[in-house]
């Protein structure tokens, strides 16, 4: 799939372990050529080039570490439709603010059980 047709993925990258897991999963989607990560801070900050990219007719996936949904909120604030929104806390990911590293077993479980199905839904144009 060409880069300009891949889903765009926006992730939380806050200070908790759950946020860092969301960011790591978005990076993995990009590294594996399954999606193109874009800058949620740029969308939230109203940066014209990043708003232009976010408004492209491509599926959008948001990956948030917790129920605050900051990545999703940044896009919605700009009236950008999110195709699939993932809240990792709804899938058993606990938010730790103690500087804990990402648990590789948890990352793999979430990848298989949550991220791959979310990607399939986004590619099918199914809102989830």
Where are the model-predicted features located?
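Iron-sulfur-associated redox domains of electron-transfer enzymes in respiratory
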Residues: 1-128
């Amino acid at each position: 799939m060409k880069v300009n047709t891949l889903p765009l993925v926006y992730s939380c990258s806050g200070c908790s372990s759950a946020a860092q897991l969301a960011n790591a999963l978005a990076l993995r989607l990009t590294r594996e050529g399954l999606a193109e990560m874009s800058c949620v801070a740029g969308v939230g900050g109203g940066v014209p080039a990043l708003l232009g990219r976010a408004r492209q007719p491509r599926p959008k996936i948001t990956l948030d570490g917790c129920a605050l949904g900051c990545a999703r909120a940044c896009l919605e604030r700009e009236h950008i439709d999110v195709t699939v929104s993932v809240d990792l806390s709804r899938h058993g990911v606990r938010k730790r603010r103690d500087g804990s590293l990402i648990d590789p077993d948890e990352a793999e479980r979430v990848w298989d059980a949550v991220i791959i199905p979310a990607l399939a839904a986004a590619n099918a144009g199914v809102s989830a």
